[in-house]
Amino acid sequence: MIYTSSDGDWFNPNEIDQDTDCDEELHHLLKFGIIEGKQIESLKTLFFEQTIEDRTKSQYRARHSIFPNEDQPKYSVQFSKYHFDFNLKEGEKCKVGVTLKDKIKINSTGSGKTTFNFCNIPVHSPNIKLTFTPSGGVIKKGQSVEILVEMVVLCTTRVRELIAVDIANSGRHLFTIKIDSKMSQVLDYKELEIGNVIGGGGYGAIYKAKWRGLSVAVKVISELSDGSEFEKELEMHKELLHHPNIVHFVGFCVSPKCLVLEYIEGGSLDKYLHNPNYTFSPQLRLKMANDIAKGMCFLHRNEILHLDLKPQNFLVVSISPEAPVSIKLADFGLATSSSRSFYGPTVEGSFLYMSPEVFTQKKFSRAADVWSYGACLIEILTNKRPYQEYDQLGYLELARVREEGLPPMIPPEIEGDLRKIIEACFHRDHTKRPNFENIEQFLDAMTDSLFNVQSSIDSSSSLISSSPSTINNNGSSSGSSSTSTSPINTNNNNNNNNNNNINNINNNYNSNNSNNNSNNSNLIIQSANNVSSGSLMPSSPGKTTPPLKHSGSFLFSRLQQQQQYQQPAPVLSSHHPSSSSSSSSSSSSSSSSPSPPTTPRKATGVPIPPFSLPSSLLQQYQQNQLDKQLSSSPSNSSLTMSSSTPNQPPTPTQSNLNIVSTSPTSKPIVPLRTFLSSSNDSTCNNNNNNNNNNNNNNNNNNSNETLVKTSRAMTDLTLSDTQKSGAVPSRSVTISGSSFIKPISIENNNVNSNNNNNNNIEATSPEKYNSHRPLPVLPTSNSSNNLNGSIISTSNPSVSSSISQMSQLISKQQQSQQQQQQQQQNTPSRNVIIPNSSTANSSSSNLNITTPTRPKPISSSTSSSSTPQLPIGGNQHSHRPLPIRAASSFEIKNNHLNLSSSPGDLFSSSPSTFEITMMERDTEDLTKLIELRSRTLKCLKVLYYSFLDSIKSFSEIKELKDCIELGQKIRNFKKDVELQCIEHLKLGWETIHDASKKFNTNGKHLQTCPSPHPSNFDGETYNKVVQFRDAAVIVGESALDGLFYLMLQLLPSHNNYRVPILDITVSSTDKIPEKDLIVKIAKIARSLKS
């Protein structure tokens, strides 16, 4: 019994009755005082099993044994209570994250000062946050102090804490806290009983565990992870509400970081699909696909993208078709929240199920999940992995195919409506793919019809035998025609609304297919009453819809075959107006023939098609009625066995229904790589047009050729040896002029002497001419003829004149200069030649002006740095000097460079003509273009070798993180090259690849594949590094092909020698590329270098 002090709020330990029945172990632990490790847990276990009163008694006994005395020991302090309840009632639970407060008083009763200190045992607890204010101090004699205790529960846990207060000269006093928290998503890791490893996620291992008796799956985050993926997946689970097709989120732990999810006993779907011991029925496979679509539709409604759809992330709840849920989605490690398309920094996820825009452009959207869903449908329906046709070609070829964006081949076993869904999911344009809402609506209708058909197969015998009524051709009972036809009409009206939703799946998919037939424009779903068509949904009344290929749906065809073999008695099926071949014959036969019995229908949303009657009593009657109908209107007779051809014998009955057709299939052919140039639209057109008549085949061939030509015109570029002869447009390029001044001066001299047709210059007196030197004496007789002979008749020059013509022009000019020099040495006098404006051809006479003045003698030994020396012959003629004018810088430069030219040319002052200006400008542009080409080629070579060294640096990788970063760097560079080529050259990557491989005789740019040293990694990590390395090398080879192609377009042909470019010898006979091409490639090189 506990006694209180006179104040009413103090416990007096001295007045507590001693109980000798206390646990000796607990007494020993309390007496020992300072304990650690397992002893603390044992103390908590024993201590908290007792009530508050028993705990106080145990502490008093332990203290009394520490301080033995005959009299009752007089303690120096008194406490108001020894248990913190935080104002909660017994059994009441506290909230997580809320601050709880309590108070305790300490009274000093000793003869002096009392020192106290609070501490928690253990001091650091990850589940609660406990503070004492103040946590220690000194209490004077006769005084008391109030301690404020605050606690915050951080997770869902059971708080069992011991609080110790050390009192000087009085030992240690223990206080208890025993509180249970309410449920929350934050869990206590100590409450998890971790079991065996059951799998691995994107960033950690998955364990099977127990949490408060519940089987859970715990995904423990690796210590090497930065935690960003953990935070992302945690946010995804917090945002999601409960959905039957999403794995239930139990909670998470903060330390260590882990996610606690619902444990699914069945495991992943991947181990069932590729295990021959498991065989799934068509109903179960379709139900699995429908469950996945429901889960994805729920995610997209909540603006969440999964981005990692694959069979490994589909958990099997049950393999029974009658179970409410078969599949649940899991693993949101790559999921993200977004309401629109966006570009991410990295690409992760599964290689085979990743959409092309995610794999190549890192573009994430809802359509990316739709593409992955289509790839998963192939594996669920046929047990074949996507891109399985490339297994024999190896991993490298598969990586190249994925890089080019080719979709996987749809197996021929998938037929009808589901094939169209998969084709729509694989649409090249991601905006034309269906959404999961339309897919869910379509699969819901198909699943309901399929299960209704299966249930009607099982119950048709008992239902028909209990109601032997007759039916007419319209499907109504002879006894009550009005009551039996109304459910059919009601069902047709209800299901017509579903057709409008289902047709939305293919509206976008077929919008661009101009060659599609009208019967394939939408997803055609026929009436469930027409068993021969194999349809799953009734069509609209009065609308004729031709039957689908292969009986519309391969799922229904398998059920139909099973029905035929199990119930061999043929029976007439009810006809819908849309399925009748001739209305007139149908009406006549219905009025003349009696009605056989019919199958009662259930009141369901989808009508149950009639099946064969197994009753042996009605077989003879049915055979007689069948003979009558066949004789009366053979065109209207429709047997339930019409799904098989008349000449084809029935196949044996199969015990287990297969989801695929049993027709023999040829070995899948690997699609050609030229398929990249054609879109999915052309592929769908070819598939749809194969069912047309022979008249349409010619149109298909013509359309295919048009598509191929159009695609090649848009994406291909052929390397032509013949270049255009048009003039290169002028473009300002800053280069040095010293390399081409001499050819310009030579051409100017030639053109000045041969341009009499366009210049009308009158001969003037010598006083009108300004010169910085005296005019020379004109030569005698034959000088004009010699000069005229040195004039070269040139055509109107263009910028595109070839180098060979230029070299011939230069050689002729040199010969003429040599002749002029020889003539000048023989002539005794000097002359000035002024062209006459009246002459129109080379035979016209030139006006010769001779100066009669005597020139001043010039010494042959004198020289000038500004003007060349003039040779003076023996015949000295007197002349007077003309007014001196300043020489231009261009003339001075020409005088320095053309020392070998004739003196008469140096002093010729005739004005430049239009042809001379064009020649100067064209030659200058040509030289600048050649220099731009050489600089661009040098830049591309530097980029080529530097990028080659980057790929070779894989041999120096020591961590998986560095390998991923290097691979991403290589991918980004390849993408930059591709985008630049598309922007400037309008070229597809297939054209660049083919052209570079044509000239690159080595085949590959890398002779040996760089490999990191295996000692730096463990076995599993090294395999991942090798896979990343192989994919990066393939992408790097493609980027090197692009750089090599750009260099091939800049073949140097302005020099008369052979120039090696990356081990390829280029002939000098190649012509200079067009100016536009050089400028575009220069822009690409500048962009890549920056």
From Swiss-Prot:
Q: Which UniProt keywords apply?
A: ATP-binding, Kinase, Nucleotide-binding, Serine/threonine-protein kinase, Transferase
Per its UniProt record, what SMART domains does this chain match?
Answer: S_TKc
The record, for CDD domains, names: STKc_MAP3K-like
Query: What one GO molecular function would you report for this record?
Result: ATP binding
Active-site residue list: D308
Per UniProt, ATP binds at I198, G199, G200, G201, G202, Y203, G204, A205, I206, K219
> From start to end residue, where is composition biased (Polar residues)?
531-543, 657-666, 675-684
Bias kind Low complexity: ranges: 462-530, 560-593, 613-646, 685-704, 748-760, 780-825, 833-868
Q: Which SUPFAM superfamilies match?
A: Protein kinase-like (PK-like)
The residue ranges crossing the membrane are: none
Sequence segments annotated as region (Disordered): 462-705, 747-881
Q: Which PROSITE patterns match?
A: PROTEIN_KINASE_ATP, PROTEIN_KINASE_DOM, PROTEIN_KINASE_ST
Question: Which EC number(s) are documented for this chain?
Answer: 2.7.11.1
The protein in question is named Probable serine/threonine-protein kinase DDB_G0278665
Which organism encodes this protein?
A: Dictyostelium discoideum
The taxonomic lineage of its organism, from the top, reads: Eukaryota, Amoebozoa, Evosea, Eumycetozoa, Dictyostelia
